[in-house]
């Protein structure tokens, strides 16, 4: 039944590619099958990505907040019957308390906006079964290094200006840049709670529908796709990601207090 709902929603426009005012793979490639087993798809009135960090917990972007969530795990293709596919509801969501609530609603980006703390935990209705196609990924323990090679993934739009969603999970290789590159690019605030990643000549970027997905640098989960330029993949406009190393204590506290 969930497959039919997903197909109809995406095909007939019942789900938007991303929450209003936010981004979030352009210039990427089809991920190798089961190479990103921690990647999840979150279906509500929007399409977002997420990351399995514990059998019972998914981390995503706070701007993906909704009144309901359907979580798809173990997926490579959203529209094919796959052996590792699992489906879960969400018992409770925990947006970061310092993320501004009005940014969760219909909001057009304004000069000076601060999207810090764009992080949310989802408690699954029942634990995911850990298999070859569904695995957890550890939280970071060290600061990421500027210049690191990073990989972002998602089912978001592959065209900067149009809503063109792929069937298959897409990956893109980008580099971690200094935050100064994003400060120069945007009128919105870029803080030390964020990471700046992309290519300065454009061509490669996360885009609409990739929000909440992973940014993995040198093999370590370091970021969650948050926001960026519209259209995506423009020169001198890298993507902006939530910096997870700044939030590990909060994440662990929420998980401990809500077993």
Swiss-Prot record:
Keyword hit for Ubl conjugation: no
UniProt key word Cell cycle: no
Signal peptide: 1-18
Superkingdom of this protein's organism: Eukaryota
Cystine pairings recorded for this chain: 31-171, 48-64, 150-217, 182-196, 207-232
Residues at the active site: 63 (charge relay system), 118 (charge relay system), 211 (charge relay system)
Domain Peptidase S1, first and last residues per copy: 25-256
Catalysed reactions, as listed in the record: Preferential cleavage of Arg-|-Xaa bonds in small molecule substrates. Highly selective action to release kallidin (lysyl-bradykinin) from kininogen involves hydrolysis of Met-|-Xaa or Leu-|-Xaa
Database matches in PROSITE patterns: TRYPSIN_DOM, TRYPSIN_HIS, TRYPSIN_SER
UniProt propeptide residues: 19-24
Pfam families assigned: Trypsin
Record: glycosylation sites: 91, 106
Keyword annotations: Disulfide bond, Glycoprotein, Hydrolase, Protease, Serine protease, Signal, Zymogen
Family: Belongs to the peptidase S1 family. Kallikrein subfamily.
PANTHER family with a match to the protein in the record: KALLIKREIN-1, KALLIKREIN-RELATED
Name of this chain's protein: Glandular kallikrein-10
Lineage, highest ranks first: Eukaryota, Metazoa, Chordata, Craniata, Vertebrata
